A protein has these predicted regions:
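Sequence signature of WD/YWTD-type beta-propeller architectures
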Residues: 19-301
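Bacterial Sec-dependent N-terminal signal peptides
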Residues: 1-20
């Protein structure tokens, strides 16, 4: 039955170029040269989290004032950093190496209001994935899931967690981790992200493109080439369509796609626009260029 669903989904043609989001202009902002990459955009669109080109450290950049605040120097902190739904807490990683030169990853939470910092996952070689839903962090380590509250009064909810293990898409639900991989285990997966309402997951299949399906693996929808996909809302995804020569990216656009197969380029050909970060509550999307430039696009549904 699953194979039939996959075949049917792959046969659905993309609806083509159509307006997915209304665009209201694009603004270039000046960020510190040492942290030119946007790691995350606050939900309310008031600040960016910036990191170095190799994802070391995190800096909070206030968009209104242009002021910066160093949050951490931790190696790897900018890779996969997560913001809580209220924008007051972050979860970031810290890479370290043992005596055998093997990498271990720890997770820390930081309250951006009071500065309180806490290690929520000790250094491990088996960290498979983590996510933030509301004010809780879900951590999958060695196929076991733990939920950490990031704020007092948090009511913990066990939503599905997705991670990549040996190029396969894994799901952890009810304390059990299993292979999910809706398009088959002969494929390689990357970039999974749960939808805001926790009913769908977007992911990318290497060499094929991005897909969305329900968290039970049904209703697979192809989205085309949309790399590093992020949910803008429960029915819209933003990502990048980049082109390279094997060494360098020479073209890239920020794309918006919906679950009906409509797609729209949000950036001009003159920019190499990469790795979008949406702030849906503020109707904004940020992105970076390989040259260290940062832009913010104003959008609306």
């Amino acid at each position: 039955m699953i194979k039939k669903i996959i075949i049917a989904a792959l046969a659905i043609p993309l609806a083509g170029h159509a307006q997915v989001l209304k665009t209201g202009g694009m603004k270039k902002i000046t960020v510190p040269a040492e942290t030119p990459s946007v790691a995350a955009f606050s939900p309310n669109g008031d600040f960016l989290l910036l990191t170095s080109p190799v994802y070391d450290g995190l800096v909070k950049y206030n968009i209104a004032t242009g002021k910066t605040e160093k949050l951490t120097d931790a190696p790897g902190a900018g890779y996969g950093v997560k913001l809580s739904g209220n924008g007051e807490n972050i979860v970031y990683r810290e890479n370290s190496y043992d005596k055998n030169h093997l990498r271990n990853v720890a997770l820390h939470s930081l309250n951006l209001v009071n500065g309180k910092r806490k290690r929520i996952s000790k250094p491990s070689r088996n960290l498979q994935g983590y996510s933030v839903e509301g004010t809780q962090a879900s951590i999958v380590n060695n196929s076991r899931k733990t939920i950490k509250a990031l704020a007092s009064g948090t009511k913990k909810t066990d939503v599905p967690s997705f991670a990549i293990d040996n190029s396969q898409l894994m799901i952890t639900r009810g304390g059990k981790t299993t292979v999910f991989s809706p398009n088959g285990t002969d494929k390689s997966y990357i970039w999974p992200e749960l939808s805001p309402d926790a009913t769908k997951v977007v992911y990318y299949v290497a060499g094929i493109g991005a897909f969305v399906c329900n968290v039970d693996g049904t209703q697979i929808v192809p989205l085309g080439i949309v790399r590093a996909p992020k949910w803008y809302d429960n029915s819209t995804i933003v990502g990048m369509k980049d082109e390279d020569d094997g060494e360098h990216v020479y073209a890239s656009k920020i794309m918006a796609v919906d679950l009906n197969g409509n797609s729209q380029a949000l950036t001009p050909d003159s920019l190499i626009a990469m790795y979008p970060q949406p702030a849906q509550k503020a109707n904004k999307i940020s992105f970076s260029t390989p040259g260290g430039e940062t832009y913010i696009i104003n959008v609306a549904k």
